[in-house]
Curated annotation (Swiss-Prot):
This is Chaperone protein DnaK. PANTHER family: HEAT SHOCK PROTEIN 70KDA. Residues 602-611 have a biased composition (Acidic residues). Disulfide bonds: none annotated. Residues 575-592 have a biased composition (Low complexity). The gene is dnaK. Keywords: ATP-binding, Chaperone, Nucleotide-binding, Phosphoprotein, Stress response.
């Protein structure tokens, strides 16, 4: 079975890992970094992903960041003169990760396990699966990020029983999961979270502070200047990271804007104490899901054996202190918070292929599922934190006499009224025989698969007629749209490969011209004019092809030049070798002459007379 890669598709950074033997290994990107910025930019028709895209974010308005926060919505982003869905942008990131994983493995990759925040709803999970499909990946499993982290942490601890709390604060989302580990079973007891809380929010607090201070001093609102705002974002992220290691950092942004008197610069120092003050409300928000998860799991703090920190934002000192204060435990630092989720996803891939044995993952649904009933009430069929996969049925009836059809309004959430919860979909069961209200028996069945994706069935028990749908939210993509996007992605991949081939050829041509010119110069007057003239003629031909830009002609002329340059190089080396041999021979003969002159037979004893 082919390798299944594990992907952590993050808000700010993503990572890809693969199982090698029994160990999960992070695959470094082409720049040598173990995580890749989740940034996509467009320039001159080219799609740029990762570090290169992030570097040009300041100057390139066609740059998309933090697309994960829009997953599962109908919101589109404008770039490159087009509108893209969040699934399409995410697919570009996935395609990039897939590409360098293939380069590392030396084989085609078609399958992946992709992680999502535990608190992602059905629409967001479906959008993630669609993004994988667009990128040419068969998504074998969608795994909750804290669960993946627990897998990576606990794989070598399957012989011991412990309860762990995973605190996952990423770039745009926050999750807390409580798991029980024992005998190779990873059982998620409860999960809670906040999909609108992450490192980006901490950055925004710094940005707002800098904008306010600059406006106070200079009367100019930098938040209205797109380029200045991007520079502020970069500076805020850097300052946040700096303050994890030092107590004060300097923010310096020369020529940030211009005033009536000329250019203006932003120079400001930010202390950790001030940063903690600015972000106090965000840190406080992390405490509620911790308490909620413990309550849902029916556990007290004393029953938690380990606290695992996941996500780059858990490096913020105030966050670490809040975790300590809330749990009464020193967090376990045995895992890398940026890499552990992708590593866990790769382990789950190993479980699917059979390379990892005796490991069972029991995940849960993060939110309750149900339907709207009379009076706009939300009637739950599956409670949150139910182990998945699962199925649950309940019988309902009609609300009016002779009602010919029932509308099934499928919802996800925790509020008592339907209007306050997330609509997943609607469908209708028709042709119900005329009968007084309360008589028809309509059985509604909810199924949640291992990926947390929902399907619903309604069946008239009298006629046995049923209607069945896999939930696709109003914000989801149709199969036709996914198919079109897959073709676009494939075309882009082919175009990217062709572009790379062109660049490689042009670089090769430049290198060949430089090397041949150098060789021709060095061999001037050395006696092999035939080879030099042939190389010069081939060089001139290649230069003409280079000017024309005809790639096929360049390739042919490059091969011809390489042949002539090689012949010239052979002559050079032959001459050098002959000269070296002659020198060595002359040296040997000289040594022999010296030896005969100094032989003992020619030594004459001298007489010495003392006066």
């Amino acid at each position: 079975m082919s390798k299944i890669i594990g992907i952590d598709l993050g808000t700010t950074n993503s990572a890809v890992a693969v199982l090698e033997g029994t160990e999960s290994k992070i695959i470094a990107n082409p720049e040598g970094n173990r995580t890749t910025p989740s940034v996509v930019s467009f320039k001159n028709g080219e799609i740029i992903v990762g570090d290169a895209a992030k570097r040009q974010a300041v100057t390139n308005p066609d740059t998309v960041i933090s697309i994960k926060s829009k997953m599962g919505t109908s919101e589109k982003v404008a770039a490159n003169g087009k509108e893209y869905t969040p699934q399409e942008i995410s697919a570009m990131i996935l395609q990039y990760l897939k590409g360098y994983a293939e380069d590392y493995l030396g084989e085609k990759v078609t399958k992946a396990v992709i992680t999502v925040p535990a608190y992602f709803n059905d629409a967001q999970r479906q959008a993630t699966k669609d993004a994988g499909k667009i990128a040419g990946l068969e998504v074998e499993r969608i795994v909750n990020e804290p669960t993946a982290a627990a897998l990576a942490y606990g794989l070598d601890k399957t012989d011991k029983e412990e309860k762990i709390l995973v605190f996952d604060l990423g770039g745009g989302t926050f999750d807390v999961s409580i798991l029980e580990l024992g005998d190779g079973v990873f059982d998620v007891l409860a999960t809670a979270g906040d999909n609108k809380l992450g490192g980006d929010d901490f950055d925004q607090k710094i940005i707002d502070f800098l904008v306010a201070e600059f406006k106070k001093e200079n009367g100019i609102d930098l938040s209205q200047d797109k380029m200045a705002l991007q520079r502020l974002k970069d500076a805020a992220e850097k300052a946040k990271k700096d303050l994890s290691g030092v107590t004060q950092t300097q923010i310096s942004l020369p020529f940030i804007t211009a005033g009536a008197a000329g250019p203006l610069h932003l120079e400001m120092s930010l202390s950790r104490a001030k940063f903690d003050d600015l972000t106090r409300d965000l840190v406080e928000r992390t405490k509620v899901p911790v308490r909620q998860a413990l309550s849902d799991a029916g556990l007290s703090l004393s029953e938690i054996d380990e606290v695992i920190l996941v996500g780059g934002s858990t490096r913020i000192p105030a966050v670490v202190e809040a975790v300590k204060a809330e749990t009464g435990k020193e967090p376990n630092k045995s895992v890398n918070p940026d890499e552990v989720v992708a590593m866990g996803a790769a382990i789950q891939g190993g479980v699917i292929t059979g390379d990892v044995k005796d490991v069972v993952l029991l995940d849960v649904t993060p939110l309750s599922l149900g339907i709207e009933t009379m009076g706009g009430v939300f009637t739950k069929l599956i409670d949150r934190n139910t182990t998945i996969p699962t199925s649950k049925s309940q019988v309902f009836s009609t609300a009016a006499d002779n009602q010919p059809a029932v509308d099934i309004h499928v919802l996800q959430g925790e509020r008592p009224m339907a209007a306050d919860n997330k609509t997943l979909g609607r469908f209708q069961l028709t042709d119900i025989p005329a009968a007084p209200r309360g008589i028809p028996q309509i059985e509604v069945t909810f199924d949640i698969d291992k990926n947390g994706i929902v399907s619903v069935k309604a069946k008239d028990l009298g006629t046995q007629k049923e209607q069945h749908i896999v939930i696709k939210s109003n914000d989801g993509l149709s199969e036709e749209e996914i198919e079109r996007m897959m073709k676009d992605a494939e075309a882009n991949a082919e175009a990217d490969a062709k572009r790379k081939e062109e660049v490689d050829l042009k670089n090769e041509v430049d290198q060949a011209i430089f090397a041949t010119e150098k060789t021709i110069k060095e061999t001037e007057g050395k006696g092999f004019d035939t080879e030099r003239d042939a190389a010069q003629a081939a060089l001139d031909e290649l230069k003409k092809a280079q000017e024309s830009g005809d790639l096929d002609d360049m390739k042919a002329k490059l091969e011809a030049l390489n042949e002539k340059a090689q012949a010239l190089a052979v002559k050079m080396y032959e001459q050098a070798a002959a000269a070296q041999q002659a020198q060595a021979q002359a040296g040997a003969e000289g040594a022999a002459d010296t030896g005969s002159t100094n032989s003992g037979d020619d030594v004459v004893d001298g007489e010495f007379t003392e006066k």
